[in-house]
Amino acid sequence: ENLSNSYTGNNEPNSAIASSKVSLDLINSAYLENRNNFSMGRKAAKICLSISKGYQKINDYNQSNTYTDQAITLLDEITKDNLPLEEDQYLYASANLQMGITLGFQDKYTESREYLEYAIDQFNQLVTAIPENRNYQFYLAKALGKDAEIAFKTGAEDAVTINDYSIELLNDLINNNPRDIFKFEIAQRFYTFSKTLVSQGEDSAARTQANLALKNLKEIRKNQPSNIEFQINTAQLFRLLTELHKKAGDTEKVIEYCREALSLSETLLETDRNVEDNNSIKLEHRSRLARDYGLLGWNLVKLKDQYEIDEARKSFKESQKIYKEILIKEPSNIDAQQGYQWASDCLVELFKSSS
């Protein structure tokens, strides 16, 4: 189990999964020898959830669901003829939250909300019974937030109410103990609501929510500047703010946020390598960097200043170069094909306009 945690911390999900499976086999063997050894059964359920999260991290959602199901089956067996302990209730709630999140990634929204609502009910019971346990309150807020994300996607009427309740719980947690994990979660809630407001044409309100998200992300990145997840989320927020300020006609802010997103993309390209594949560069970071260079170029062109035009040309060339690198590795990558063609077309138009 300690080895699995080490692999997880080192960003080696496949190694973490393999190590956890070895532990699971050993614990399952002990549990099968004595079905009344519920302590072993609970340990097995915990490891199943850990494996499920590992598979979710590498986007193998079917395997993730399989191990969450296995955890729930173990818990059903443990509590069949016994009142569930607090630990059992927590594991049940965690399993339902995990399943709800994974089903959401698979666009199975109805099923996702069913599991998330089970988790919300179970965490709510734990919070009511043990209000001093801030961990339970956090996971209740997280389950509500994930439910709100699905509700926003499906246009459910209760989306804003659920999201607001999640934010209320998180604000209470932050006021008592401003931990980074609480601030990161509340930033997610503001970001989700901001995207929904954009889709509804409420750009001013969307900017307000996006700036609240950015405020929290900036605070936690001061404490953990090398945290990959914080960097990825901050970069996507800069991209959203770029689009929002573009609509508002605030060119200065557009360029500022373009540069911020690009800077983080360059950092991620170097720091978030695929440790399990000879420390290779991850394709998603190449793609984002190529897009960010292209968007910076596009927005600089609109300024129509010669200095900015020269920088725009360099940005398009860099975007084109990175897309070409992607296509060397994946010739059939449609996004890269389209991105390369777009950057090439932009360079042609720049050449024509300067002739």
What residues fall within each predicted segment?
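Terminal, low-structured helical/coil segments at or just beyond the last alpha-helical repeat
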Residues: E325-S355
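Structural motif corresponding to the intra-repeat A-B loop/turn of tetratricopeptide repeats
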Residues: N10, I58, M99, Q106, ...
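Residue register of alpha-helical TPR repeats
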Residues: S39, K43-K46, E87, L91-S94, ...
